[in-house]
């Protein structure tokens, strides 16, 4: 039997995802029409022998998370449970803390997936590679260009055996163009090195009597504390993929991930893609429209558009490279490009909401999304436009390269602004 663990983090993470993470936990943000981690769960559920999927994180189990878990269990006919950490424990601390739940039933191996990645999840190929070698740790790797590789965990492998000889998390100088995808397959024996790190933390004096210092020993970073330490010892191997992959750290990267997933729907879920029908809107490229959305027949949608539940799209609307969330309204003849329109927001007639894409360099096949700061030299860098929850944009204005926080009612145009 097999299990899967999805690391969803907590509210102290995902600050670059604001203001979108104000309304829902980042792992539940809709990407290509479904919550971000549903893509992970779908991939895990398709692996033969999968018996249980565990979510580990520090979020409070609110109504949204509870409803998602119930819906996932019904849809995939698998136990999907949430295990809440008592404190943020890092990428490995939760695995060690909940080791008994993970190992219950004696699984052959278990997948570990970070929630904030977009991928085609070649889990069956990883399982096949694991069964050939049966080493404790198998990492999924891909390639990046020299400059961008410094923003990731870098892997030096033996090209014949694929053993990880050296691992450095976000090195200061170039190490390798092979990077860590944040998707792993572990044997039960992989928890022993995590126990060693925990015991070493105790011996180093990080565990004290006061309750507030308890997470010190429990905090384990897989990348620095385990992978870097065990590289070159015959325990960690890498499985390379040339499939789709991207981190989802910012709202801009969510829009890029939506494009990747919508493109993949052509193979995996063609029923989710809208088709042009007589009397319906004009569809260009890959578009997702929730069944409850109301779209005027003269609207032009796509490519890379995702329209959520209860959305209203008026006559003559042009929508491209954008996500429109639950309950939003785009009135007649609005134009929305490279933007995310928040829950319940309204864009007035003849208004234009536009952002600047920060996609990877299309001329470099190994280019990845840049996770740069919002600011440079005190100025807001051009990026996608984000309208938070229940924002009202008046008629005939331009909102360009701006971020509007929730519950704002604007009265004029804005360019390169954060509207607080």
UniProtKB/Swiss-Prot annotation:
SUPFAM superfamilies from the UniProt entry: Nucleotide-diphospho-sugar transferases (SSF53448)
A GO CC term attached to the entry: cytosol
Binding site for GDP-alpha-D-mannose: 85, 247
GO biological process: cognition; GDP-mannose biosynthetic process; GDP-mannose metabolic process; glycoprotein metabolic process; motor behavior; muscle organ morphogenesis; negative regulation of biosynthetic process; negative regulation of nucleobase-containing compound metabolic process
Compartment(s): Cytoplasm
Keyword Cytoplasm: yes
Tissues expressing this chain: Widely expressed.
PROSITE patterns: HEXAPEP_TRANSFERASES
GO function terms (MF aspect): enzyme binding; enzyme inhibitor activity; enzyme regulator activity; molecular sensor activity; transferase activity
Region ranges (Hexapeptide repeat domain): 273-420
Keyword presence, DNA-binding: no
Location of the region described as C-loop in the Swiss-Prot/TrEMBL record: 356-384
Cross-referenced InterPro entries: GMPPB_C, Hexapep_transf_CS, Mannose-1P_guanyltransferase, NTP_transferase_dom, Nucleotide-diphossugar_trans
Keyword annotations of the record: Cytoplasm
Residue span of region Substrate-binding domain: 2-251
Entry note about domains: The N-terminal substrate-binding domain adopts a Rossman-like fold and has a binding pocket for GTP or GDP-alpha-D-mannose. The C-terminal domain consists of a series of tandem hexapeptide repeats that adopt a beta-helix conformation. The beta-helix forms several protein interaction surfaces involved in assembly of the GMPPA-GMPPB mannose-1-phosphate guanylyltransferase complex. A loop extending from the C-terminal domain (C-loop) is involved in interaction with other subunits of the GMPPA-GMPPB complex and may be involved in allosteric inhibition of GMPPB catalytic activity by GMPPA.
Family listed: Belongs to the transferase hexapeptide repeat family.
Role noted for this protein: Regulatory subunit of the GMPPA-GMPPB mannose-1-phosphate guanylyltransferase complex; reduces the catalytic activity of GMPPB when part of the complex. Mediates allosteric feedback inhibition of GMPPB catalytic activity upon binding GDP-alpha-D-mannose. Together with GMPPB regulates GDP-alpha-D-mannose levels.
Record text on subunit structure and interactions: Component of the GMPPA-GMPPB mannose-1-phosphate guanylyltransferase complex composed of 4 GMPPA subunits and 8 GMPPB subunits; the complex is organized into three layers, a central layer made up of 2 GMPPA dimers sandwiched between two layers each made up of 2 GMPPB dimers.
The protein, known as: Mannose-1-phosphate guanylyltransferase regulatory subunit alpha
Record gene name: Gmppa
């Amino acid at each position: 039997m097999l299990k899967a663990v999805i690391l969803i983090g907590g509210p102290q993470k995902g600050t670059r995802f604001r203001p979108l993470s104000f309304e829902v936990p980042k792992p539940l943000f809709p990407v290509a029409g479904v919550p971000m981690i549903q893509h992970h769960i779908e991939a895990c559920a398709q692996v033969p022998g999968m018996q249980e999927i565990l979510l580990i994180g520090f979020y409070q189990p609110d109504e949204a998370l509870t409803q998602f878990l119930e819906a996932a269990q019904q849809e995939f006919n698998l136990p999907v449970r949430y295990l809440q950490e008592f404190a943020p424990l890092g990428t490995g601390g939760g695995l060690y803390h909940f080791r008994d739940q993970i190992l219950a039933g004696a699984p052959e191996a278990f997948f570990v997936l970070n929630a904030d990645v977009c991928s085609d999840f070649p889990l069956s190929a990883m399982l096949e590679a694991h069964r050939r070698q049966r080493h404790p740790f198998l990492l999924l790797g891909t390639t990046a260009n020299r400059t961008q590789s410094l923003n990731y965990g870098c892997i030096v492998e033996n090209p014949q055996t694929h053993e990880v000889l050296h691992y450095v998390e976000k090195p200061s100088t170039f190490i390798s163009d092979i990077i860590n995808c944040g998707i792993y397959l572990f044997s039960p024996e992989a928890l022993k090195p995590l126990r060693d790190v925990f015991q070493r933390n105790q011996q180093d004096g990080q565990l004290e009597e006061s309750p507030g210092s308890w997470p010190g020993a429990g905090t384990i970073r897989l990348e620095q504390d385990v992978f870097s330490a065990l590289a070159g010892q015959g325990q960690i191997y890498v499985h390379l993929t040339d499939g789709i992959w991207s981190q989802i750290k910012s709202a801009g990267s969510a829009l890029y991930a939506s494009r990747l997933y919508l493109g993949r729907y052509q193979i995996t879920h063609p029923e989710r893609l809208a088709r042009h029908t007589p009397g319906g809107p004009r569809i260009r490229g890959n578009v997702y429209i929730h069944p409850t959305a109301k779209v005027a027949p003269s609207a032009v949608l796509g490519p890379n558009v995702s329209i959520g539940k209860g959305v209203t799209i008026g006559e003559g609307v042009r929508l491209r490279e954008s996500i429109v969330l639950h309950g939003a309204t785009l009135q007649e003849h609005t134009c929305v490009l490279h933007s995310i329109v928040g829950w319940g927001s309204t864009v007035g007639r003849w208004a234009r909401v536009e952002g600047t894409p920060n996609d990877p360099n299309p001329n470099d096949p190994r280019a990845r999304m840049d996770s740069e700061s919002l600011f440079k030299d005190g100025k807001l860098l051009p990026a996608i436009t984000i309208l938070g929850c229940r924002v009202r944009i008046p008629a005939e204005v331009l909102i360009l390269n701006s971020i509007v926080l929730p519950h704002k009612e604007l009265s004029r145009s804005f360019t390169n602004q954060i509207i607080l």
